[in-house]
Structure formats: C-alpha cells, structure tokens
Amino acid sequence: MNDTTHKTLEVEVLNIHKGEYLSEALKRQGYPMLPSNAIINKVMTGTGATYMELNPKLSPRNSIVIEPYRSAVENKVQAFDEVQGVFKEVTVKKLTAYLNNSNIKYKKIITTPEGFQTKVLKAAKSLKMNIYKEFFNLYDKSEHITEDTDYRR
C-alpha cells in the first residue's frame, strides 16, 4: 500500500467588488500579486488574473502562464510587448535567446502544456535554469486542462 501524506489547501474567501479587477481585490486584501500554491476559483471570467500575471508592473517577477489552447496564447501575446508566446513556429533557440535577453527584466512566457514540455523545459535546461524556483507558474483555465485529459476521480 502506498503511504502518501495528503495535504489540504486552506480555503480563504476573498471578495471582488462589482467592476473591480482581481489585482485590485487581491491588493485590497493584502496580496501584492497572485499567491503561490493556490487555486483561485474566481467563478467569473474577465477579472484580469492572466493580465495581472503577464503585466510586469502588476507582477514584477518571472512568469510562465500555461493556457489550454493555442488561440488563447495567440490572443494574449498580442496584448503585451515583452511576452514570449510559444507556438509551433517558435524554436527552442528563439526561446533561449528571449530568456537570455538582459533588456527584459521580468521574463513572461505563455504557452500550451505541449509547448511547456517540448520547448520551455528544453530551453531552461540548456541554460541550466531551475524554472521551478526562478519562475511563477500559472495554469490558466486549469479546469479545461483537467477535462481535456479525461480526469476521473
């Protein structure tokens, strides 16, 4: 029998006022950025969680955002100048050059799960980067990733 320790997440309810963005609600309640090791069940779309993480003024840290679909990656790349999208056309070499670009203080990568596995991890390995320590990772729309992998309880 597998003796695994089960951990539970502490539930904390944070309220978003009508017309308020998630970044504003979090800051009002003591969180300067999206918290680590948390599941945010924000129920409604368009509150700005991904925008907050991809904006270096709102989230001054290196970030990797994983989207379930390429179309979401494409749409969000268009909204930010210094965000590196990972598509079929983006090579590991190009991604490595982005990660080495000293003119970009906070690296922001947006990718699909496949791009993360086949390109982001390879680029990080080639640079001897520990992206698990050097980057914040946001799984956007994680419910889609779970559904698409046919998760069963």
Locate the predicted segments by residue.
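Signature of the SF2 helicase/ATPase Hel1-core->accessory helical subdomain module
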Residues: 115-153
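Inter-Walker segment of RecA-like/P-loop motor cores
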Residues: 81-131
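A general structural signal for short secondary-structure junctions and capping/turn motifs
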Residues: 31, 55-57, 98-103
